[in-house]
């Protein structure tokens, strides 16, 4: 019998980086379709434009680094980054928002650190935070869900609003943002925080039309869609369960604790879990294998830290949704988390 001598590793995982990225995109489809249904065609238009920008910036940087662009484009990591950023911004954000955002995501947050596998921060969240701090008006002008508008925004109007700033009737983005055409309004989390700041109780804040019996109108279905996609990712072993479970468990625990002691000032766990970018963050953003913790215990700590930070920022921060800030702050703690949670070497 002939024996073959080969060097380690002897066990191989057939899944490559492109395969994993494809699974992430496929499982994000339910959330994308839900967002498109409730918030209009602008979501799909932004996605296509973001992917085109991501591919362009990725190829340009690879050429500047004197490396073949095809190799970088084949892993689809730029496409996933574009996907995550495009669904995180308002559907009718002006086109230059994505240009700036994708530049920061691909060129600064990814390739400035050495490319895929070297970036300490999630590129999409770096871009989102830069945009949110620099252009708060454009980044907080969300459409009202389709069920709360008299007439849904057409594909042509969405396209024109993004690339010209005016819809087919000549209304500017600023006019739409002020509610003249009734197509834009604050997100449920923003409306809840504004109502509390104005002196209303939590129950009074939740009586606004942005909220249903479960959570924010439209947003609850978007989050449930991302939850379904996230569970498929876990079942397919594309991601592990530790970070999402710790994230959602920590957020639920904090909201329950404060709901018990300050019921008039705290949103219920369902509001926190099914509003904003909670499920998108738990399953598709925080689980980034490059910028997340690598040890089993570390992933639990990492996820719990994000969940706690999300609750703190939503409750007392200056922004209604804190997922992006929480993820970046947790990314900063990853080296420390991994150092103290690494398994002991046998015999030491």
Curated annotation (Swiss-Prot):
InterPro entries: NqrB/RnfD, RnfD_bac
TM helices/strands, residue ranges: 20-39, 72-91, 120-140, 214-234, 241-261, 266-286, 300-320, 321-341
Modified residues (FMN phosphoryl threonine): 187
GO biological process: electron transport chain; transmembrane transport
Keyword annotations of the record: Cell inner membrane, Cell membrane, Electron transport, Flavoprotein, FMN, Membrane, Phosphoprotein, Translocase, Transmembrane, Transmembrane helix, Transport
Main location: membrane
Cofactor(s), names only, from the UniProt record: FMN
A single cellular component GO annotation: plasma membrane
E.C. designation(s): 7.-.-.-
Location in the cell: Cell inner membrane
Membrane protein topology class: Multi-pass membrane protein
Keyword Membrane: yes
Sequence similarity: Belongs to the NqrB/RnfD family.
Cited function: Part of a membrane-bound complex that couples electron transfer with translocation of ions across the membrane.
Subunit and interaction comment: The complex is composed of six subunits: RnfA, RnfB, RnfC, RnfD, RnfE and RnfG.
Protein name stated in the entry: Ion-translocating oxidoreductase complex subunit D
Protein's organism: Vibrio atlanticus (strain LGP32) (Vibrio splendidus (strain Mel32))
Lineage, uppermost ranks: Bacteria, Pseudomonadati, Pseudomonadota, Gammaproteobacteria, Vibrionales
């Amino acid at each position: 019998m002939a024996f073959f001598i080969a060097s380690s590793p002897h066990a191989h995982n057939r899944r490559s980086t492109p395969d994993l990225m494809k699974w992430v995109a496929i499982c994000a489809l339910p959330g994308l379709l839900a967002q498109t249904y409730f918030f209009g065609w602008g979501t799909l238009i932004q996605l296509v434009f973001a992917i085109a920008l991501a591919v362009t910036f990725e190829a340009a940087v690879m050429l500047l680094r004197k490396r073949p662009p095809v190799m970088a484009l084949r892993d689809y990591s730029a496409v996933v980054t574009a996907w995550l950023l495009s669904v995180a911004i308002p559907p009718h954000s002006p086109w230059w928002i994505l240009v700036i955002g994708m530049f920061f995501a691909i060129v600064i947050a990814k390739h400035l650190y050495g490319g895929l596998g070297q970036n300490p921060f999630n590129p999409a969240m770096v871009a989102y935070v830069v945009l949110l701090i620099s252009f708060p008006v454009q980044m907080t002008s969300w459409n009202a869900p389709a069920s709360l508008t008299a007439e849904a925004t057409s594909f042509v109007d969405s396209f024109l609003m993004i690339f010209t700033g005016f819809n087919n009737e000549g209304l500017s983005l600023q006019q739409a943002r002020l509610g003249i055409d009734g197509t834009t309004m604050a997100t449920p989390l923003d409306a809840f925080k504004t109502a509390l700041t104005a002196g209303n109780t939590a129950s009074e804040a939740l009586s606004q039309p942005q909220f249903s019996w479960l959570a924010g109108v439209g947003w609850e279905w978007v989050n449930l869609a991302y939850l379904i996609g996230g569970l498929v990712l876990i079942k397919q072993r594309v991601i592990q369960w530790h970070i999402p479970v710790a994230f959602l468990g920590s957020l639920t625990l904090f909201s329950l604790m404060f709901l018990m002691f300050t019921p008039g000032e705290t949103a219920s766990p369902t509001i926190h879990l099914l509003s904003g970018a909670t499920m998108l963050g738990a399953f598709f953003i925080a689980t980034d294998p490059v910028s997340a913790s690598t040890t089993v215990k570390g992933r639990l700590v990492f996820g719990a830290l994000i969940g706690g930070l999300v609750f703190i920022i939503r409750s007392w921060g200056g922004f209604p949704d804190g997922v992006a800030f929480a993820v970046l702050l947790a990314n900063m703690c990853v080296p420390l988390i991994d150092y103290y949670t690494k398994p002991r070497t046998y015999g030491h």
